[in-house]
Amino acid sequence: SGKQALAKKEWLKQRFDEGLVFYRSEERGKCFIEYIPTENAWVPIEAGGWLYINCLWVSGSMKGHGYSSELLSECIRDAKEQGKKGICILCAEGRKREFLADPKFLKYKGFKVADISDCGINLMYLPLAENADQPRFKDCARHPKVSETGFVLYYTDQCPFTYYWVPKVQEAAKEHGISFQAFHITDKEAAQNVPAPVTTYALFRDGEFLTQGIQSDKKFLALAGIK
């Protein structure tokens, strides 16, 4: 919807001063890459002097045409031009998971695993400078945990889908008497200390990390055991 897109655009606008680049190869947002200097990335990682890819998105109909390679090449070119140590990105261990990069594609492009989170999300990196310090997760991302019981969600406006679905999930939880707390992350400092490797959407249940996949109200109720 228009409001969803506005929330995302507003978030982007505020990041451009921090060095964020949004590069699109096809119209209407079907293929794009979004990256930012690691110092300003909204994730709990330690990696000074690198670029962090927030999102490398190629929609279904566009897959298989080399757009991912083209977008990644543009990011690599820019990183070299800026004299960065390399590029890092999140992916799931072993397989493609929703809202995360494809590990097989990254491996094929020369990325290696820099660090592993207990929840099966990896930080991958492509070094561009010799003897560059490897990026790594902060402890809060390496061992994701919260103290609260019930469902706890951390989310940002980086992905337009959160604007639409988070209130719907909140309503569904309230309606069914499900314990649910949502923490809307609105600044970099808070994002860099979230107790999860992903900050766009990190859902916990009874202290344990559950998923980075943005839930619809129906999906959420299924997770909560309500049919």
Tell me what each language-model feature is.
Residues 1-26, 40-42, 189-191:
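Active-site rim helix/loop that mediates acceptor-substrate recognition in acyltransferases
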Residues 24, 28-39, 52, 57:
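Conserved beta-strand in the GNAT
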Residues 58, 64-80:
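Conserved acetyl-CoA-binding loop-helix of GNAT-fold acetyltransferases
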Residues 90, 107-124, 210:
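Conserved catalytic-core motifs of GNAT/GCN5-like acyltransferases
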Residues 140-175:
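Local sequence-structure signature of Cys/Sec-based thiol-disulfide redox active-site neighborhoods
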Residues 206-227:
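Non-catalytic, surface beta->alpha helical segment in thiol-disulfide oxidoreductase systems
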